[in-house]
Amino acid sequence: MIPGEYQIKSGQIAINTGRETKSTIVENHGDRPIQVGSHYHFYEVNPALKFDREATKGYRLNIPAGTAVRFEPGQKREVTLVLVAGAQRIFGFRGDVMGDLEIKNG
């Protein structure tokens, strides 16, 4: 092995297998690009992103860790979200939750 070398297994890697997911349409009403990281609580993203916010409480993007999705001004796209795992307690971000999630599934 060479220092810094990656040895990557061939084929597809499944992420979040068996976890609850949902899709939503998101539109950037702002005048600047907005980037959302893989583990950001989607409910608390930039207010310039317009979507059914209440339906996304407790969810994050269903993308590989360390990656992000970029929304250009005026861009509309569908994203897939995955339910946050673990104790489902959210702290930080924009401070909209700050504790236990009260998720209304259905």
UniProtKB/Swiss-Prot annotation:
Protein's name in the database: Urease subunit beta
UniProt subcellular location: Cytoplasm
Family: Belongs to the urease beta subunit family.
Assembly and binders: Heterotrimer of UreA (gamma), UreB (beta) and UreC (alpha) subunits. Three heterotrimers associate to form the active enzyme.
Principal location class: cytoplasm
Origin organism lineage: Bacteria, Pseudomonadati, Pseudomonadota, Gammaproteobacteria, Enterobacterales
Pathway it works in: Nitrogen metabolism; urea degradation; CO(2) and NH(3) from urea (urease route): step 1/1
GO biological process: urea catabolic process
The keyword Transferase is annotated on this UniProt entry: no
